[in-house]
């Protein structure tokens, strides 16, 4: 529940339609049928008409709409359009979010550049963790980490050295750094 992370915001105390995924990603799933009658009846569905839901963004920080990168102040509700292929997702300002390529299975494009998306507004840190992905060798120390640090006052991202190793590890990891803004693309 949101109140665990935003106890000072009384609007989150009884809010049970949203949740945080990790410390940075606010998810507001569509819980009621919007494109069907909800009873399984065979009805004509008009996918061209966008529906919307109200999403509360907790106070104490700013938020970015994941799909548009629009920056929004917290402490208020916003109406978010919910076409059939969009779930309302918001990212807390001061977050670093890794985004991998679209794949059909986990190791399909393991050497593709990894997008590191910066959501400015506060200083941020993030540790990228990688391992073999298909066994328990990480319990024996077979994994690697790379630390990222965003300094918001200077708009500087520092990327640390890789620590550790594992079988099949890429010799060279390529990053595409993206500063979230309405000009930098969406989702």
Q: PLM ranges: what are they?
A:
Residues 1-156, 165-186:
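Catalytic core of carbohydrate-active enzymes
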């Amino acid at each position: 529940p949101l109140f665990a992370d935003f106890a000072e915001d009384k609007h989150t105390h009884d809010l049970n339609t949203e949740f945080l995924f990790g410390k940075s990603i606010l998810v507001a799933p569509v819980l009621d049928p919007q494109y069907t009658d909800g009873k399984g009846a065979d009805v004509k569905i008009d996918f061209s008409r966008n529906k919307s839901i109200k999403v509360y963004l907790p106070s104490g920080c700013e938020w970015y709409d994941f799909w548009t990168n629009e920056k929004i102040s917290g402490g208020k509700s916003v109406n978010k359009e919910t076409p059939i292929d969009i779930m309302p997702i918001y990212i807390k300002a001061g977050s670093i979010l890794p985004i991998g390529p679209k794949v059909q299975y986990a190791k399909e494009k393991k050497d593709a550049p990894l997008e590191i998306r910066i959501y400015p507004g506060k200083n941020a840190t993030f540790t990228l963790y990688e391992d073999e992905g298909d066994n328990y060798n990480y319990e024996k120390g077979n994994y690697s980490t790379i630390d990222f640090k965003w300094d918001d006052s200077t708009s500087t991202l520092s990327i640390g050295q890789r620590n550790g190793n594992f079988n099949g590890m890429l010799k060279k990891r390529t990053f595409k750094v993206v500063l979230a803004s309405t000009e930098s693309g969406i989702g």
